[in-house]
């Protein structure tokens, strides 16, 4: 088993769990996985997750599942990814689990291609929840009038969300609706996904973090309604962005909260380079302080360069270097906290 990428310690531990007389005993199963196209990294992941697969009867247990996966158009290229992500597909009961789960997914998604796409994103735990929770949660969404296309997109992009415990799922749905989201609108699915993927403790930590900037609950909620995905960022990322935009650039926290889309951009790759250029232009009096946060960060690179770098290159030839982070404000004799 050492040859499949496992450390000697892991190989020894798994051998002990399986009561192997020799680490070489499951070589036929390892060779089988390699023949399917799995890399050593993928095989080691499979072995760690489902070590008993190594002792499964290939002919009676594994090959029927493999035949089923191929029958639903899981290509040879897709098999390694599908199996490494979810090795349970090769050991769960075909009649009692895999086929019923497939039928549930197929009834919603209609195409095998979308079912395979969904299977790639399901963990072993999620796969176990398809029959238990999936159908009930779909009924909740359909009962709210959520469009079929939106449900399909949610399932294919984040199937684990719809596999959540039924009570947990329903509670979060009610909470999202209470925040003002309409199930018919696309933002509802994004908000539900973020809320279900964030633990109550983490959610509270993020809300408390915004409150420390002086933002009210209504302001935070408005930001979430405008751009739900910003709450999926880590608290550290959110606080770093707020610190730069408020303390370095001088924007009010409420202004940042009214434009939550700015959290979609990288601090190092977009926000700091662009804001550095803007700060130089402001300090030199070449642009007005009324310039909006959105116009700075959401415009394309080409437009930004034309409006703020090329336009002023004769008066400030160093702007290109500032934009490319080859030169900082200090090199020009400025600081972010200047006004």
Residue ranges and their predicted role:
Residues 1-339:
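Long amphipathic alpha-helical repeat/alpha-solenoid cores
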């Amino acid at each position: 088993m050492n040859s499949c990428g496992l450390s000697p310690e892991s190989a020894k531990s798994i051998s002990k769990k399986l009561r192997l007389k020799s680490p070489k005993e499951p070589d036929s199963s390892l060779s089988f996985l390699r023949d399917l196209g799995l890399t050593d990294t993928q095989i080691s992941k499979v072995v760690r997750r489902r070590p008993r697969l190594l002792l499964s009867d290939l002919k009676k247990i594994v090959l029927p599942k493999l035949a089923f996966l191929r029958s639903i158009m899981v290509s040879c290229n897709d098999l390694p990814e599908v199996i490494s992500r979810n090795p349970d597909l090769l050991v769960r009961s075909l009649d009692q689990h895999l086929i019923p789960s497939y039928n549930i997914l197929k009834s919603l998604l209609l195409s095998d291609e979308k079912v395979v796409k969904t299977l790639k994103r399901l963990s072993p735990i999620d796969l176990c929840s398809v029959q238990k929770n999936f159908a009930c949660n779909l009924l909740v969404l359909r009962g709210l009038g959520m469009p079929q296309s939106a449900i399909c997109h949610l399932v294919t992009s984040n199937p684990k969300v719809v596999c959540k415990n039924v009570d947990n799922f329903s509670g979060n749905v009610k909470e999202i609706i209470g925040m003002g989201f309409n199930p018919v609108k696309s933002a509802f699915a994004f908000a539900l996904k973020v809320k279900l993927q964030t633990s109550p403790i983490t959610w509270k930590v993020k809300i408390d973090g915004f409150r420390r900037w002086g933002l009210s609950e209504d302001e935070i909620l408005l930001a979430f309604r405008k751009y739900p995905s910003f709450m999926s960022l880590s608290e550290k990322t959110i606080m770093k962005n707020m610190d730069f935009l408020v303390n370095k650039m001088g924007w009010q926290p409420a202004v940042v909260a009214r434009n939550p889309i700015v959290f979609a951009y990288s601090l190092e790759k977009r926000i700091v380079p662009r804001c550095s250029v803007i700060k130089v232009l402001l300090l030199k009096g070449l642009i007005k302080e009324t310039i909006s946060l959105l116009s700075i960060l959401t415009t394309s690179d080409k437009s930004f360069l034309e409006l703020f770098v090329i336009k002023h290159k004769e008066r400030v030839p160093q702007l290109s270097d500032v934009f490319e982070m080859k030169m900082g404000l200090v090199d020009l004799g400025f600081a972010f906290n200047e006004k």
